[in-house]
Curated annotation (Swiss-Prot):
Sequence positions that bind ATP: G10, A11, G12, K13, G14, T15, R123, V132, Y133, Q200
This protein's record includes keyword Kinase: yes
Pathway note: Purine metabolism; AMP biosynthesis via salvage pathway; AMP from ADP: step 1/1
Main localization category: cytoplasm
Species this protein is from: Shewanella frigidimarina (strain NCIMB 400)
EC number: 2.7.4.3
Disulfide bonds: none
Biological classification of the source: Bacteria, Pseudomonadati, Pseudomonadota, Gammaproteobacteria, Alteromonadales
Reaction equations catalysed: AMP + ATP = 2 ADP
Protein's UniProt name: Adenylate kinase
Family to which this protein belongs: Belongs to the adenylate kinase family.
Record note on domains: Consists of three domains, a large central CORE domain and two small peripheral domains, NMPbind and LID, which undergo movements during catalysis. The LID domain closes over the site of phosphoryl transfer upon ATP binding. Assembling and dissambling the active center during each catalytic cycle provides an effective means to prevent ATP hydrolysis.
Region (LID): 122-159
Gene that specifies this protein: adk
GO biological-process terms attached to the record: AMP salvage
Amino acid sequence: MRIILLGAPGAGKGTQAQFIMEQYGIPQISTGDMLRAAVKAGTPLGLEAKKVMDAGQLVSDDLIIGLVKERIAQEDCVKGFLLDGFPRTIPQADAMAENGIEIDHVIEIDVPDEEIVKRMSGRRVHSGSGRVYHVVFNPPKVEGKDDVTGEDLSIRPDDEESTVRKRLGIYHEQTKPLVDYYGKVAAEGRTQYNKFDGTQSVTKVSEQLASVLK
């Protein structure tokens, strides 16, 4: 079972990825992890990627595709794999198809931007312990203070509203077009495309996923 998971940052992809991995015994392949592993293992592609990254440049699509092919040929991918954070763009999706990497399911977790902003910009963290709160969903007993120590809570830079909106803008510009792309591929019968409402409970989304993936 070869799966691509699409959805904006904060849509809840990580939680559902975990569910899919445990349920179907397939590994999650994230390009970041894959790059680090290839560099560490010193494979020819890994060494090439290291050279590019050390020079402060972006790793090319061709190189990433090579790494994906190398990774999915490994033993733990026999039953399939879950691609996370790749492809991000239509040229990458085209390159995958040209390289014969077939996908059985494309899953989109859809959450409106305003809901994502509410989810992410409402997070508060106690830096000393890593305890996480949410002003709406899981508020501290005293506003702005950690329940245990009474110390101040802070907002992670990644959770600042301006940062969240910027990341959402990049997602809509680069990755959202993949939804239409895979919609067409599905219409041609070359994959299955399903969209899930990510504002539902985690359990509900997991149940719906399971009914599609069985």
